[in-house]
Amino acid sequence: MSALNDKSVDNGRIARRFAALKAEGRAGLVTFITAGDPDLETCRAVLHGLPAAGADLIELGLPFSDPMADGPAIQAASLRALHAGTTARKTLDLVRGFRETDADTPVILMGYYNPIHAYGVDRFLADAIEAGVDGLIVVDLPPEEDEELCIPALKAGVNFIRLATPTTDDKRLPAVLQNTSGFVYYVSIAGITGAASADNAAVGAAVERLKRHTDLPVAVGFGIKTPEQAAEVARVADAAVVGSAIVTRLAGGLDADGKARPGLAEDVLGFVRELAGGVRGAAF
């Protein structure tokens, strides 16, 4: 773990949540939604309902017009959110509103560097902390560019969560992990989000390999679509991450004009409850 990890990172909501999960003897469920998808009101309803539905940590996508690492489902969600007028500032407003009723559930912003750079790194970090953001996943900033955002984030007390993939070999892994904090996000399939699910034995072996290099929790995502798949991952990892399947469920509740049908938020939260049931029913 990096010397940059100060107390505000090490003892923050993410660390406390994983410690609580470990004490309960179970893995966590990490849910992803895109901020402002399909509109701010519906997104707000889903966001506020996620903890009660069983989400242990929340990833909130920062909409961007060119989400190159994402598959069609999350690309479409990002475009819907942008069309609805969602900005980085409004994304932080969503987190701020969430914190009025939930002081404990970790919120991680996930996205690309461009909107953060346009906002201004120092101002973004200050506003993110004030809003109640716990961590960042910025998929297009490799370790070689840590000075851009990763190191300022850690110094400010914001976790910087890095992705590891099946192609991250033992030579590359120390660089990936050096300034990572909060948890490691293992992408179980090399490619875009929402692709086919990975072989669980391979995922288990990959988690074991990561654990040899870091004491941080390991969350596994990409390709988890069902409660059964979430349960399989929960047996070998510290958390299962579900994103595209939730976003796809949300998209299925839109009318021909792309507007939310009545009951959409409740339907999405019902699906999250099913996923949480899978995760919580899995034994280590």
Curated annotation (Swiss-Prot):
Under Enzyme Commission nomenclature, its number is 4.2.1.20
According to its UniProt record, which residues of this chain constitute the active site? Answer: 59 (proton acceptor), 70 (proton acceptor)
**SUPFAM superfamilies linked to this entry:** Ribulose-phoshate binding barrel
Entry keyword set: Amino-acid biosynthesis, Aromatic amino acid biosynthesis, Lyase, Tryptophan biosynthesis
Q: Which GO terms describe its molecular function?
A: tryptophan synthase activity
Please verify whether the record's keywords include Amino-acid biosynthesis: yes
Recorded catalytic reaction(s): these are: (1S,2R)-1-C-(indol-3-yl)glycerol 3-phosphate + L-serine = D-glyceraldehyde 3-phosphate + L-tryptophan + H2O
What sections of the protein cross the membrane?
A: none
Its annotated pathway reads: Amino-acid biosynthesis; L-tryptophan biosynthesis; L-tryptophan from chorismate: step 5/5
Identify the GO cellular component terms for this protein: cytosol
Similarity comment text for this entry:
Belongs to the TrpA family.
User: What biological function has been recorded for the protein in this entry?
Assistant: The alpha subunit is responsible for the aldol cleavage of indoleglycerol phosphate to indole and glyceraldehyde 3-phosphate.
Quote the HAMAP family the UniProt record gives.
Answer: Trp_synth_alpha (MF_00131)
By what name is this protein known?
Tryptophan synthase alpha chain
Protein source organism = Azospirillum brasilense
